[in-house]
Regions:
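N-terminal glycine-/lysine-enriched basic segments
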Residues: 1-180
Length: 182
C-alpha cells in the first residue's frame, strides 16, 4: 500500500478515533459506552478503548492517541480538544500532500502557525482565582463538586506555584495531603 491509498487508510483511523472521542468535548459532552460495562465522558479513556482491525488505520488512530496521551500527561486534561485539533491538522496536511506540497514545507507551516497561535493565547490569557479553579475542576471531574472543592482547597494550601499529584486511594475516602518541599 503506497501514497494515496495508505494516506486514506491512515486518515480513516484518525477519523474513526476522533469521531468516537469528540462527542465527549466540554461540560455538555456526551457519555460513551465502552465494552458494555464502562460508561465514560473522558476522552482519553475512549481513545484508549479504540482498537481498529486494519493495521494502517490503527496507525492513524495511534497518532491521535499519542497526542491525547501527551496532553493528558502534560496538562491533566484537554485530551478531547487535542484529539479534535490533531485530526484537523492531519486532515489539512493530507490535503496539501495530495496537491503536491512536500512534507517539509507542511511541517514548517505548522510550526509557524503554532508559534502564532501560542503568541495569541499568551496575549489573551487571564489569571484565575480559586472559584474558577473549583469550576474547572468540577467540570473536569464530570461535574463532581466535591472534587472541585477538594482541588480548590489544595490550590489554596499550596499556592499557584505548588504542584498537585493525584494518587489512587485503596480506601473510599478522598483527601488532601500536603507535603512540604525542600
Amino acid at each position: 500500500m503506497f501514497n494515496d491509498e495508505a494516506r486514506l487508510k491512515l486518515l480513516e483511523g484518525v477519523n474513526t478515533l476522533a469521531d468516537a472521542v469528540q462527542v465527549t468535548l466540554g461540560p455538555k459532552g456526551r457519555n460513551v459506552i465502552i465494552k458494555e460495562t464502562h460508561l465514560t465522558k473522558d476522552g482519553v479513556s475512549v481513545a484508549k478503548a479504540v482498537k481498529l482491525d486494519d493495521p494502517i488505520a490503527n496507525i492513524g488512530a495511534q497518532f491521535i492517541k499519542n497526542a491525547s496521551s501527551k496532553t493528558c500527561d502534560d496538562a491533566g486534561d484537554g485530551t478531547t480538544t487535542a484529539t479534535i485539533l490533531t485530526r484537523a491538522i492531519i486532515q489539512e496536511g493530507m490535503k496539501y500532500l495530495a496537491t503536491g506540497v512536500d512534507p517539509y514545507t507542511i511541517k514548517k507551516e505548522i510550526d509557524s502557525d503554532v508559534k502564532i497561535v501560542t503568541e495569541y493565547i499568551n496575549s489573551i490569557k487571564q489569571e484565575i482565582d480559586l472559584n474558577k479553579i473549583k469550576q474547572i475542576a468540577t467540570i473536569s471531574a464530570n461535574n463532581d463538586e466535591s472534587i472541585g472543592d477538594l482541588l480548590a482547597n489544595a490550590y489554596e494550601k499550596i499556592g499557584k506555584d505548588g504542584i498537585i499529584t493525584m494518587e489512587e486511594n485503596k480506601g473510599s475516602d478522598t483527601y488532601i495531603r500536603v507535603v512540604e518541599g525542600i
